[in-house]
């Protein structure tokens, strides 16, 4: 296995959100379809996926999965990236990102790893066979 730290930047091309039914006094929840382009760094390609979000006066959270198609460290294929964040009040969000086990295809078959995802940035430590 080869271990790599991969860092990449991305832009969000599509953010199509639909609010769920509102609950009096409850936070706003929504479902989002998204598309991204990974533009620089160790990941180059595109991604499409889905996200669920919750936002209220006491905090916010989201969970998402996206299928990334492109190259990682020069290897071509696809994998599914799962990521989430939780924020209490106006504090800093706590984030996590990881590759769904067994989701890699092509030259990325067997890829695994985890790290973090921020506004426009991805930072993972991955293992490739």
Predicted regions and their residues:
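Beta-strand-enriched cores of mature, soluble protein domains
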Residues: 1-129
């Amino acid at each position: 296995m080869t271990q790599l730290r991969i860092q990449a930047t991305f832009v969000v091309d599509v953010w199509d959100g639909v609010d769920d039914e509102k609950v009096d006094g409850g936070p706003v929840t929504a479902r989002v379809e998204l598309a991204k382009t990974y533009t620089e760094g160790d990941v180059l390609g595109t991604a499409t996926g889905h996200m669920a979000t919750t936002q209220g006066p006491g905090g916010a959270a989201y969970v998402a999965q996206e299928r990334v198609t492109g190259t990682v460290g020069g290897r071509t294929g696809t994998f599914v990236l799962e990521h989430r964040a939780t924020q209490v009040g106006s504090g800093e969000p706590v984030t996590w990102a990881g590759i769904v086990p067994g989701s890699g295809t092509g030259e990325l078959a067997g890829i695994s790893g985890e790290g973090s995802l921020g506004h426009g940035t991805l930072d993972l430590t991955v293992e490739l066979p």
